[in-house]
Amino acid sequence: MRELKIGMLQLHNTADIQKNIENLIEGIKDLANRGAELVVLQELHNSLYFCQVEDVDNFNLAEPIPGPSTEIYGALAKECGIVLVTSLFEKRAAGLYHNTAVVFEKDGTIAGKYRKMHIPDDPAYYEKFYFTLGDIGFKPIDTSVGRLGVLVCWDQWYPEAARLMALQGAEILIYPTAIGYESSDSEEEQQRQREAWTTVMRGHAVANGLPVVAVNRVGYEPDPSQQTNGIQFWGSSFVAGPQGELHYRACTDDEESIIVNIDLERSENVRRWWPFLRDRRIDSYGEITKRFID
């Protein structure tokens, strides 16, 4: 058995960025004190989900990497002796911004980063206004707790992203997330959306024989433009094993601080039973790079 203790923080954010960061620091320290070796945070965890509106003033939230936030979280990872997965609004240059996951090693150094590749542009999720498409590619990040396949939110709907991480030796798929209901959706529609979200990532776990970690924010955030009813983030952060089995799923309506133990060696056994990578017809997939096959 190769056990890994994974900590997750499912939090409700406010407009007070300093308070959000203080809550994160407190939560990360608590998880470390409870034995977490790897801690994963939600998408854009320092602030509200500002992409509900297109507002140039929100670019002031972005910061360089390295920068103030990486100093805070790097020092925290070192103090706690953990590997830490964060999600930041990166200012790469004037007018050039990314939605970037930064992974810190136990000594506080940056182990690697991933720039979100799939960028949505839908009502209440106007991310193309803020974020440039990622250009690092789908590259796992090597850490002392394993090779991490870190992706971000909208990436979770694309099996190609998970597969490319798996083909490069990722041992865990990790998804910092910010997703919720449009507040006027019916209860039935809310349930369908939440279950689809969980199911697609559990499918990635099965198809690739890897555990999956998804960490979502929770709580209501109003639409500053008042064009929609705002977003009710549905929480439900979870860990699934390499057969898609749920080890834990958080609640939909409250903050949670979670530790889940997983056995990284299970992937080896599962892939022996279900050798999907062996049986791939790599000679027949060339057309998958087309937008559509007419």
What is each of the regions a protein language model found here?
Residues 3-13, 20, 100, 113, ...:
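Active-site-proximal beta-strand elements of phosphoester/diester hydrolases
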Residues 6, 103-111, 239-247:
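Short, glycine-anchored, charge-dense loop/turn motifs used at functional sites
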Residues 17, 29-106, 110-113, 179-210:
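Cys-nucleophile CN-hydrolase/nitrilase-fold catalytic domain and related Cys-dependent amidase chemistry
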Residues 62-85, 153-256:
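CN hydrolase (nitrilase-like) catalytic-core segments centered on the catalytic cysteine
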Residues 86-88, 100-103, 139, 237-239, ...:
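Short beta-strand scaffold segments in enzyme catalytic cores
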Residues 100, 113-115, 249-251, 259:
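Residue-level detector of high-confidence beta-strand sites
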Residues 116-130, 254-271:
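A short, polar/charged loop-to-alpha-helix boundary motif
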Residues 138-168, 177, 267-294:
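Cysteine/selenocysteine-centered motifs that mediate thiol-based redox chemistry or coordinate metal-sulfur cofactors
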